[in-house]
């Protein structure tokens, strides 16, 4: 997983 994807997941609150 790329950091950018993890950031998006955290932003969505998933």
From Swiss-Prot:
Listed GO biological process terms: defense response to Gram-negative bacterium; killing of cells of another organism
Chief localisation class: secreted
Keyword Transcription regulation: no
Keyword Secreted assigned: yes
Keywords: Amidation, Antibiotic, Antimicrobial, Secreted
Sites bearing Leucine amide, chain numbering: 14
Subcellular location: Secreted
Tissues expressing this chain: Expressed by the skin glands.
Family: Belongs to the frog skin active peptide (FSAP) family. Hyposin subfamily.
Protein name: Hyposin-H6
Lineage: Eukaryota, Metazoa, Chordata, Craniata, Vertebrata
């Amino acid at each position: 997983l790329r950091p950018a994807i993890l950031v998006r997941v955290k932003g969505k609150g998933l």
